[in-house]
């Protein structure tokens, strides 16, 4: 190969070759402009120095001879964008191409009209591929599904022989020279490190390089026969040469013990055999099953990651069938209503579902949420003002109670006697329909429309304004309680009690008090006490729902800590913006992902998708908004359809024709499993309402179920 020859590609589709051996300042050699879109990869033939291959977003691959000014061959994948192309090291005429739709194609450069083989390698775009330098039939691929797969191409059909799960989309893969099972990878985003994997141990990397501070864009081994030096470039504007002996080994920091719960509550625990055998006092548990497995001991760097096995044991603790049953979870998920109804109906329905599954605490929670957040018209609330009249929302209009006239035994209230420190009972008649004292002068106040500021002024119902009279202890120190006239205007003449205290009477002589303010109402604690009534509520008849938000938040945190993310997420969805701001976004996302994972474990796919759609968390809403691509084959010749229309390029027939209207079905397609004819869903349904025979005329008796 010519070490002075370079090839580059640009986003405008231009492929440029550079000759560093030119004596002039301009090193550009050739320029090719045949691609119409971004060129993702250029690759030289391993043995032919003048043969260059390119793959572009336009779906075409072109082979250039650098001795000519145009391409010598054009290969149409008849598929999505080409992501990578790679010549086989061992096979002169073969190259592999990977595509946006997850397919991999093998081509012979002598036959540009059709690929030799095609198979689906990944769920999503395949970003890279690399042929094994020693084994002719091994092809490694990496994709957006975070997997690296090794395929055996020597068989009739491509066979997956190894699979490595990574933590991010795989951008580049490169086999390590002279190490058959080692492969280097780097990520397209999130993870900036370079990993070297042993495909026989896919769960932890054998080596790791951590020098880059941004996304690694390319990796290559320095020489075809040098396994110790790796070159890498990154978006952090650095080019590193890594020495393999300086690589960190994640196995040194790995935990050799494992713990995992199964879907139905079984607990599996794996540990070293030596660790378990050293515990001589360990007693066998009920449901404890032992299985021999293998873990690897800490590796010496000089051993080049050779396999040395050490015995380990796996214990499985099985739970009782009844106690481990998760039927309640499945039934709850299927029966819960999360949207489409008023809040009160949703809460009532979900409370009924929880009650039917004997989950009384959850049912009570839904009932309380209905009371807290529903409107007045949907919930019968308790009068918070203690109204005595039926249907009334105002205080009863009573001026005074004569404690001597109150019959005993009609009502009781236990309170604490602060002077004696003992509990006692006082009887008070609470009946708004009864007249306790005949006060004709006050009749004009009852039911009147006097403005509230005339009755109360600016005084609110504070605790300091309420006076409790002691009528059971007449021998206690006598004290007169007075009500300033400026707060409660008098409606009739009240005679001062002769037993008033002097220090209260002296208050009228104070120079800081006006004459009107000095006039007071004096009441004897033994005789009676006054209640000044108003014509409107002191309080709103309901507390605002925001008042209870901290309590609801703590309730959801309680359920989540107990492991019941189903209740936490369901309440989040039903309440929506009423409670969403009370819980931080990260906590919500954790609850949603946990619940969605449980739903998918139980294969409740529709409910999982509904939760994603109704989610109030932005990160969760994006889970089902990824682009979905559907690739179809021609129903006549079985050839993959191109993205340029609904007519097959080969047989010139329209794909997916409706048997009723004879137009292409571009949406939902329904077909008969007996004769394979079909069409638009509405057309087929309407046809089968009047006829049981296939609309295509094949004579088959079709049935829509």
Swiss-Prot record:
Report residues binding Zn(2+) 1: 634, 637, 648, 651
The Enzyme Commission number assigned here is 2.3.2.27
Task: Indicate yes or no for the key word Electron transport.
Answer: no
Chain positions recorded as Zn(2+) 3 binding sites:
672, 675, 700, 702
Coiled coil residues, start to end: none
Quote the catalytic activity from the record. S-ubiquitinyl-[E2 ubiquitin-conjugating enzyme]-L-cysteine + [acceptor protein]-L-lysine = [E2 ubiquitin-conjugating enzyme]-L-cysteine + N(6)-ubiquitinyl-[acceptor protein]-L-lysine
Q: Which GO terms describe its cellular component?
A: cytosol; GATOR2 complex; lysosomal membrane; vacuolar membrane
Residues binding Zn(2+) 4: 677, 694, 698
The pathway that the record names for this protein is:
Protein modification; protein ubiquitination
Q: Does the keyword DNA repair apply?
A: no
Q: Repeats (WD): which ranges? A: 1-28, 34-74, 77-117, 121-161, 165-207, 211-254
PROSITE patterns in the record, alphabetically? Answer: WD_REPEATS_1 (PS00678), WD_REPEATS_2 (PS50082), WD_REPEATS_REGION (PS50294)
- Residues the entry annotates as binding Zn(2+) 2: 658, 661, 680, 683
Q: Where are the zinc fingers (RING-type)?
A: 656-705
* Zinc finger boundaries on the chain: C4-type: 633-655
Keywords associated with the record: Autophagy, Lysosome, Membrane, Metal-binding, Repeat, Transferase, Ubl conjugation pathway, WD repeat, Zinc, Zinc-finger
Q: Which BP terms does GO give this entry?
A: autophagy; cellular response to amino acid starvation; cellular response to nutrient levels; positive regulation of macroautophagy; positive regulation of TORC1 signaling; protein K6-linked ubiquitination
The record ties this protein, via InterPro entries, to: WD40/YVTN_repeat-like_dom_sf (IPR015943), WD40_repeat_CS (IPR019775), WD40_repeat_dom_sf (IPR036322), WD40_rpt (IPR001680), WDR24 (IPR037590)
Could you describe the subunit structure of this protein?
Answer: Component of the GATOR2 subcomplex, composed of MIOS, SEC13, SEH1L, WDR24 and WDR59. The GATOR2 complex interacts with CASTOR1 and CASTOR2; the interaction is negatively regulated by arginine. The GATOR2 complex interacts with SESN1, SESN2 and SESN3; the interaction is negatively regulated by amino acids.
Q: What is this protein called?
A: GATOR2 complex protein WDR24
Q: What is the lineage of its organism?
A: Eukaryota, Metazoa, Chordata, Craniata, Vertebrata
């Amino acid at each position: 190969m010519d070490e002075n020859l370079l090839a580059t590609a640009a986003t405008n589709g231009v492929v440029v070759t550079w000759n560093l051996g030119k004596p002039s300042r301009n090193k550009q050699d050739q320029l090719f402009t045949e691609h119409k879109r971004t060129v993702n990869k250029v690759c030289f033939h391993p043995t032919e120095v003048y043969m260059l291959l390119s793959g572009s977003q336009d779906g075409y691959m072109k082979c250039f001879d650098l001795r000519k000014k145009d391409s010598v061959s054009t290969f149409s994948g008849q598929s999505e964008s080409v992501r990578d192309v790679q010549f086989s090291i061992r096979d002169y005429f073969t190259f592999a191409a990977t595509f946006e739709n997850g397919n991999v194609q093998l081509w012979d450069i002598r036959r540009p009209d059709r690929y030799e083989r095609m198979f689906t390698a990944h769920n999503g775009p395949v970003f890279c591929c690399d042929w094994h330098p020693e084994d002719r039939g091994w092809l490694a691929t990496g994709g957006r599904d975070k997997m690296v797969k090794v395929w055996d191409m020597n068989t009739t059909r491509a066979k997956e022989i190894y699979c490595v799960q990574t933590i991010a989309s795989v951008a580049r893969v490169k086999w390590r020279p002279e190490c058959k099972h080692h492969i280097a990878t780097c990520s397209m985003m999130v993870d900036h490190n370079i990993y070297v994997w042993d495909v026989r141990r896919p769960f932890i990397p054998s080596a790791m390089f951590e020098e880059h501070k941004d996304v690694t864009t390319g990796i290559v081994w320095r020489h075809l026969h040098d396994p110790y030096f790796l070159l890498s470039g990154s978006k952090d504007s650095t080019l590193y040469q890594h020495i393999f002996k300086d690589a960190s080994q994640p196995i040194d920091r790995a935990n050799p013990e494992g713990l995992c719960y199964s879907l139905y509550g079984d607990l599996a625990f794996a540990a070293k055999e030596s660790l378990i055998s050293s515990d001589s006092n360990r007693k066998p548990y009920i449901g404890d099953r032992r299985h021999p497995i293998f873990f690897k001991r800490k590796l010496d760097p000089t051993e080049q990651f050779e396999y040395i096995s050490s015995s380990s044991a796996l214990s499985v603790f099985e739970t009782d069938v009844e106690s481990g049953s998760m039927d309640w979870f499945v039934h709850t998920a299927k029966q819960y209503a999360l949207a489409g109804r008023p809040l009160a109906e949703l809460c009532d329905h979900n409370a009924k579902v929880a009650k039917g599954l004997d989950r009384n605490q959850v049912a009570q929670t839904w009932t309380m949420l209905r009371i807290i957040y529903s409107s007045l018209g949907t919930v019968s609330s308790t009068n918070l003002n203690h109204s005595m009249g039926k249907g009334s929302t105002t205080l009863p209009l009573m001026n005074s109670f004569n404690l001597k006239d109150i019959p005993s035994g009609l009502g009781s209230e236990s309170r604490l006697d602060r002077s004696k420190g003992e509990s006692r009972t006082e009887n008070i008649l609470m009946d708004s329909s009864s007249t306790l004292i005949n006060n004709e002068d006050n009749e004009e106040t009852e039911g009147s429309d006097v403005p509230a500021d005339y009755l109360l002024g600016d005084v609110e119902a504070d605790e300091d304004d309420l006076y409790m009279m002691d009528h059971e202890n007449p021998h206690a120190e006598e004290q007169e309680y007075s009500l300033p006239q400026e707060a409660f205007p008098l409606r009739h003449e009240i005679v001062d009690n002769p037993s008033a205290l002097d220090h209260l009477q002296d208050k009228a002589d104070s120079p800081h008090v006006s004459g009107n303010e000095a006039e007071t109402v004096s009441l004897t604690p033994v005789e009676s006490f006054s209640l000044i009534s108003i014509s409107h509520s002191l309080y709103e008849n309901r507390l605002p729902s925001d008042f209870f938000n901290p309590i609801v938040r703590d309730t959801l945190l309680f359920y989540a800590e107990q492991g019941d993310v189903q209740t936490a997420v369901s309440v989040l969805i039903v309440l929506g913006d009423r409670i969403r701001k009370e819980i931080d976004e990260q906590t919500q996302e954790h609850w949603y992902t946990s619940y969605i994972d449980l739903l998918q474990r139980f294969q409740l796919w529709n409910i999982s998708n509904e939760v994603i759609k109704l989610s109030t968390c932005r990160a969760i809403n994006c889970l089902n908004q990824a682009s979905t691509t559907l690739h179809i084959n021609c129903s006549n010749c079985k050839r993959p359809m191109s993205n340029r229309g609904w007519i097959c390029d080969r047989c010139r027939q329209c794909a997916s024709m409706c048997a009723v209207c004879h137009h292409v079905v571009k949406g939902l397609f329904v077909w008969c499993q007996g004769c394979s004819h079909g069409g638009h869903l509405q057309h087929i349904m309407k046809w089968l309402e009047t006829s049981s025979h296939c609309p295509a005329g094949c004579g088959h008796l079709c049935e829509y179920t």
